[in-house]
């Protein structure tokens, strides 16, 4: 009985701790407007929102490391990476040239006014948010070499 009660409290606490994605509209690099809540809402699909900037070396290393596994992960885990650039109006012009050189397969969104960053209370980058069925199920701040393995294990557990 005690174990059952503890399990219910734990599961209830986890469910309560999940935050919904905010309804924020951003532009893609092709100038198309998308809403992060409604346009990334396929049932049971996992969305990895990776917040980054052109001036952030760890951010670029993280996106490069994920890219090495992306084709396999996206098939195996039914997941998609959405790279959200927080470059402001001064540095946003560097995003497209960097993307042209990297050839990342990700959807890239521009948060130049940092509306999504603020709505999610993100202090600094790199910052990764995992969303499933509209709820934020995991967050991670920072990147160290090999961090993609931790990300993969987290994705597998979902």
Placement of each model-derived feature along the sequence:
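Sec-dependent N-terminal signal peptides
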Residues: 4-13
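Boundary of Sec targeting at the N-terminus
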Residues: 16-19
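A short beta-strand-turn-helix
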Residues: 25-46
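Short pre-active-site segment immediately N-terminal to redox-active cysteine/selenocysteine motifs
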Residues: 44-47, 51-55, 124
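Hydrophobic beta-strand anchors of alpha/beta hydrolase catalytic cores
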Residues: 48-49, 81, 128
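Structural microenvironment flanking redox-active thiols in thiol-disulfide oxidoreductases
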Residues: 61-101, 115-116
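Short, internal strand/loop/helix patches
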Residues: 96-131
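Thiol-/selenol-based redox modules, centered on thioredoxin-like
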Residues: 129-158
């Amino acid at each position: 009985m005690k174990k059952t009660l503890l399990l219910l409290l734990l599961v209830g606490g986890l469910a309560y701790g999940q935050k919904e994605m905010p309804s924020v509209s951003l532009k893609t690099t092709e100038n198309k407007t998308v809403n992060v809540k409604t346009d990334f809402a396929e049932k049971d699909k996992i969305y990895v929102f990776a917040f980054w900037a052109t001036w952030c070396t760890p951010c670029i290393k993280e996106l490069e490391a994920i890219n090495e596994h992306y084709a396999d992960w996206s098939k195996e885990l039914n997941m998609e990476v959405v790279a959200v650039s927080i470059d402001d109006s001064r540095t946003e012009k560097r995003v497209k040239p960097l993307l042209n050189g990297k050839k990342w397969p990700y959807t890239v969104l521009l948060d130049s006014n940092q509306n999504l960053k603020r709505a999610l209370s993100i202090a600094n980058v790199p910052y990764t948010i995992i969303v499933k069925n509209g709820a934020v199920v995991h967050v991670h701040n920072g990147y160290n070499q090999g961090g993609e393995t931790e990300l993969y294990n987290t994705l597998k557990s979902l």
